[in-house]
Amino acid sequence: MRIAKKWIRNNLMKHSSIGGANMRYFKNYCLFIVITLLLTGCAGVETKKSPSNSKLTIESYNMSEKETLLISKTGVEQIEFFKLNGTLKEDDDLQFSVEVFENGKFKEELLKTWDELETKYNDSLISFGIIDNRDEDHSLKLLNGIPSGLATTFYSNNMTTSSFGLLIDEKMTLEKNKPIYLTAWLGTTKNELRSGGGTTGELPLGIEEAELAIIYKVLWTDKEKK
């Protein structure tokens, strides 16, 4: 930048005898160069800062009436969408999965996806939905919508009462290696069941009372070495 300023000062002195019109042209040209250099410098600083200040956020996506109507035509009774924003570093990864609990105890992990193809998220949508096939084959169809596609599986279900709810109520910043739980489906064969909702991305309180719990989570972590 000092070299650019010195070049401009020398040329201004050298061309002090130039006519008014030419001088105005020369000043405008110099101003253009200075602005270009400043913008380039600012861009360079921003580029250097972004890798060390990685930030990933997630928040619930509120569907419009039209979107809700369209979803209702697909047969998906319960579904929630979320918006992702931020950039992953080269050695980072986002994992999406569903955790299953029986009587409050962890049983297994389903629909786990990792090694995300996308690394930059700008209002990128993810979702988790459930189709209850209780009247057909007593199963739940689980839908895991991720930035790069859709994963599905079936899970046996003999619950007679269930609830489905969000586990976050505002934009949340992901912390590395700390899962955020986004939605919870709770089921029981009893007549009563506590709501499975929450606000802070933690496991719901009603999980211990539910005979079956299916929880959707996202985890920011290191990329698994192949």
Predicted regions and their residues:
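Short N-terminal edge-element motif at the start of the domain
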Residues: G44-N103
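Short, Lys/Arg-enriched N-terminal segments with co-localized hydrophobic residues
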Residues: R2-N22
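Bacterial N-terminal signal peptides that target proteins for export
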Residues: A21-C30
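Extracytoplasmic electrostatic interaction patches
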Residues: L111-K226
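Short aromatic-acidic-glycine turn motif
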Residues: N103-L110
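C-terminal motif of bacterial Sec signal peptides marking the signal peptidase cleavage site
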Residues: L38-G41
